[in-house]
């Protein structure tokens, strides 16, 4: 039997959240072990778009965290050992109907009241910023603070940055159990050995309920599939990251998505690819792309 490995903190899951936690704890000189049953960014963090989009957040803790997160990206771009392709492109929420305009007027007002740099602009102003926009839109909300990042590179940067600071990174390692002593975590059992630690952080994403169940915790997370179309490289056509007002409505009111549609998000990466998204489907852990899902995105 292998001798147990001792560490201060075990982080389960090397997606963007787990890798970020490991990196920042390692900067505080803690002994950190990062466990991942697949590879770095092999789950949701490697299958998402790259929007750093403040306008889609409701005032409150989500917008507060998003604003603080955005302030850190320039520093992270300099600190991390991997180019993360962060760009502050500005962002727009495109408004296509009077109902959307009314809703966005209130939404923008609430965001402005908590300090977000965002404003409503009319059709002509929006099309001046983005000439590719349809002449049939009513306008948009605009923030110069929105941007994009490469989520895979960012996750790899956190994980490899943590490793360079002394953290241990194990990929292809599955967690089998979590031991407790007197009501406290004492060790994590894996198929590669036992890791003794006083702190275990569950950053397993959609698999967090499986980890929670090992210590009797019911974690209310369900997987949701979001399909995205990725195009071939194109010449620069889009200056801003954009989403539709329908996207925000569907995000906060999933039950109305069947009526109004899921909306659309669109961005052009630094390399020229367009990312067009996305669907919102509760289909368990089915990761397959579907003709119907891609058709719905393309039809938007």
Indicate residue ranges for each PLM-predicted region:
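Short beta-strand to alpha-helix junction loop
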Residues: 64, 94-103, 142-160, 288-293
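Gly/Ala-rich phosphate-binding loop of Rossmann-like dinucleotide-binding domains
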Residues: 22, 26, 161
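Active-site substrate-recognition segment that forms the wall
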Residues: 23-24, 50-53, 82-86, 184, ...
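Dinucleotide-binding Rossmann-like beta1-alpha1 core, especially the glycine-rich loop
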Residues: 49-129, 263
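Glycine-rich FAD pyrophosphate-binding loop
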Residues: 26-46
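Helical element adjacent to the flavin cofactor pocket in flavoenzyme catalytic cores
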Residues: 141-198
């Amino acid at each position: 039997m292998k001798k147990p490995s001792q560490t201060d903190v075990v982080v389960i899951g090397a997606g963007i959240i787990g890798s970020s936690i490991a990196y920042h704890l390692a900067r505080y000189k803690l002994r950190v072990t990062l466990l991942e049953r697949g590879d770095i960014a092999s789950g949701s963090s490697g299958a998402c778009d790259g929007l750093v989009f403040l306008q889609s957040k409701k005032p409150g803790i989500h917008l507060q965290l998003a604003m603080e997160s955005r302030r850190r990206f320039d520093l992270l771009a300099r600190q991390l050992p991997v180019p993360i392709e962060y760009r502050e492109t500005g962002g727009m929420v495109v408004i296509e109907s009077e109902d959307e305009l009314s809703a966005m007027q209130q939404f923008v007002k609430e965001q402005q009241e908590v300090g977000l740099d965002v404003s409503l602009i009319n059709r002509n102003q929006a099309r001046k910023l983005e000439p590719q926009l349809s002449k049939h839109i009513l306008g948009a909300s605009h923030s110069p603070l929105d941007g994009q990042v490469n989520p895979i590179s960012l996750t790899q940067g956190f994980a490899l940055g943590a490793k360079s600071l002394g953290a241990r990174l194990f990929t292809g390692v599955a967690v089998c159990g979590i031991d407790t002593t007197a009501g406290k975590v004492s060790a994590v059992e894996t198929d590669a050995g036992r890791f003794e630690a006083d702190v275990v952080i569950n950053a397993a994403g959609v698999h967090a309920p499986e980890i929670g169940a090992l210590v009797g915790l019911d974690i209310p997370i369900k997987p949701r599939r979001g399909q995205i179309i990725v195009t071939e490289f194109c010449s620069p056509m889009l200056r801003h990251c954009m989403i539709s007002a329908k996207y925000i409505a569907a995000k906060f009111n999933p039950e109305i998505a069947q009526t109004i549609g899921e909306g659309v998000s669109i961005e052009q990466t630094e390399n020229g690819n367009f990312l067009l998204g996305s669907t919102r489907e509760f289909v368990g852990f089915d990761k397959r792309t579907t003709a119907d899902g891609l058709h719905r995105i393309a039809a938007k």
